[in-house]
Amino acid sequence: MDSNTVSSFQDILMRMSKMQLGSSSEDLNGMITQFESLKLYRDSLGEAVMRMGDLHSLQIRNGKWREQLSQKFEEIRWLIEEVRHRLKITENSFEQITFMQALQLLLEVEQEIRTFSFQLI
């Protein structure tokens, strides 16, 4: 995994955790949780690609990995839409920058997961 991506995830998660969005803080906490889950999934998928010999054990151990992959893409799409929505409604420049960076990171991670999954298929 690219060290810039790791620091980007950590930076965005730290920034999001500092935001105070009033009644929508539960939604923000949900986004943070999904971001963390997405990072872990992307990392594990990347590790499986690095150990291409592990492909068969991945498929045997988890016969539903394609279903999980589909679910992760749905989560990414939801997060992208949620971040875009937040970006449209916020007037705070700190939040705008954070959400713009989060959106860029989500698009990069989506592409990485697609690349990893094609290598595993």
Curated annotation (Swiss-Prot):
Position of sequence motif Nuclear export signal: 12-21, 85-94
This protein's UniProt keywords: Host nucleus, Host-virus interaction, Transport, Virion
Coiled-coil residue spans: none
Locations listed in the record: Virion; Host nucleus
Any one GO CC term of the record: virion component
GO biological process, one term: exit of virus from host cell nucleus through nuclear pore
Lineage: superkingdom: Viruses
Subunit structure, as described in the record: Interacts with protein M1. May interact with host nucleoporin RAB/HRB and exportin XPO1/CRM1.
Family: Belongs to the influenza viruses NEP family.
Function of the protein: Mediates the nuclear export of encapsidated genomic RNAs (ribonucleoproteins, RNPs). Acts as an adapter between viral RNPs complexes and the nuclear export machinery of the cell. Possesses no intrinsic RNA-binding activity, but includes a C-terminal M1-binding domain. This domain is believed to allow recognition of RNPs bound to the protein M1.
Any further remark recorded for this protein: Average number present in a viral particle is estimated to be 130-200 molecules.
Protein name: Nuclear export protein
Taxonomic source organism: Influenza A virus (strain A/Chicken/Hong Kong/FY150/2001 H5N1 genotype D)
Encoding gene per record: NS
